[in-house]
Amino acid sequence: SDPVNTTKPNILLIIADDMGLDATPGFSIDTSKPNMPQLEALMNSGVRFENVWSNPVCTPTRATILTGRYGLRTNVINVGDVLSTNETSIFDLMNTNAPEYSHAVIGKWHLSTDPNHPTSMGVDYFAGLLAGGVQSYSNWNLTENGDTNNTTEYATTKFTDLAIDWVDSQTQPWFLWLAYNAPHTPFHLPPGAASSLPTDSASIEANPLPYYQAMIEAMDFEIGRLLESMTDAERDNTVIIFVG
């Protein structure tokens, strides 16, 4: 018989913000879809879960993923509720039961505005956005392990750059929670987008759908850039989970 593979897999959890089945390839809901070759490739080579439900808003969903508990038990039921540091997180459990894993959260947190909250929840490395949104994807506050500074780097690209750098520095099995802010408002045309869409706010407000889709396409491109930065062996040994 073939030898058993004892190599522990890496785990990559990718979270899109405000993206439903209407914008997801492979589902019949809605006929206008963004172009997402990276996600389509993952779906075609993986498993598609068709009976999965989430909270309709950010904070309770993220708290449930982090703790495995319903909002009625964590008291996180509304946008902006703070998750108590007394809760046991998946990172706490990994620290206890799988200490060989390194782990990070990169991107949107939205469980507290305390810059030390992610590390208090057991996260080895946090770099991202504490709040629920930004006024501009190109002018926002980046918090990295407790230190907050303004950045003008495009958020979707910056999160990917941080993810690439972190993954590249790992020497042991890893778990990366990569939470994009896209395609959450404000709707806009991403930099470098191959489109002739006008960029004034009146045009966006009049017909936001193509801008929403362009933001998703930019995120899909960045997912591809992250995957392409890995070696074939590392990518083959990585469990990739995409949720919206």
Please report, for each region that a protein language model flagged, where it lies by residue.
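Formylglycine-dependent sulfatase
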Residues: D2-G244
